[in-house]
Amino acid sequence: GGQIYRDVDRAAASRGHILGADYTDGRRLTGDLRQSGVEHISGAVVWAIEDEFRISYTCEERGAQIEADRILLATGALERPMPIPGWTLPGVMTAGAGQILLKQSGIVAQGAVLVGSGPLLYLIAAQMVRAGTPPAAMIETQTLGDMIRALRHVGGALRGWPYMAKGLKMLAEIKRAKVPSFTGATQIAVEGEGKAEAVTFTHKGGRRRIACETVFLHHGVVPNTQAARSLGIGHHWDAAQSAFVPELDAWGQSDVAEVFIAGDGAGIGGAKLAEHAGRLVALKIAQNAGHLSTQVCNRLAAPPTPRSDTGTGRTPVSECCLSALCGRVKPCKQHRDLPL
């Protein structure tokens, strides 16, 4: 997890004006972590969690193990796969991968085409505009019908008006940069001989073709549940998000004793909700370990409340944004082989 703050201590000074205040705010958390005295092993890859919570990982090309009494998983989210014809061609990657290039290396693809839907697509487009390298086009899959259906969440969205204001600001940045936008696109495909050379799609009844060498795909995010599943934690289907989420109580404790989950790995809610969820889990772990009484734990936990208003791990405003921008992931009615 933690992709929103990736490399924040190093990149904030040089690229903070491009990545925005939500990104640079991560220095507050990394600063608190350094002052806490907690041992922080960065750049590690965990590849096994065995009996008695023996964790095997690799760091700086060396293997190591550590044992724990309790485990807190904060694995974050994964981008939902968007398999379209040509998606395996060199030059095609997820929008999140494009953002990682910007955060870690300051690299912005020239003339890239953004394809899909979701708030992250607008964020990356706005960041590319600020970097002086706007996308060649945005090809969006959400329809007018999706926007209309999202109106039922407008009350919750207004309660979270600062988020709406941020979204409107991003849209204004993209519009001022005159980035071509095509909403309600269908039959999207990437063309090319050995690499991406163009994106073709249907828009308002006509076929269009935009030449490009880089394509960023995005169709929302889902919880990264690989570690949770490997531990045997129960999961259930979240119909609103069209994804499996782990079975957790209000504090983030799973049905496997002494395993807790916080952040988007527990259900998509964004960075701020993840931060609050992490605090709740930390309090519960401290209580279970005998360092806090139940009364003190409950007092420190409120507010925020253990769960959001929707009961799904998402805030009212995120419900509105996800519904409007992503629509509902529609099940395929007929299977057919596609040229990939």
List each language-model region with its residue ranges:
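Residues forming the flavin
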Residues: 1-340
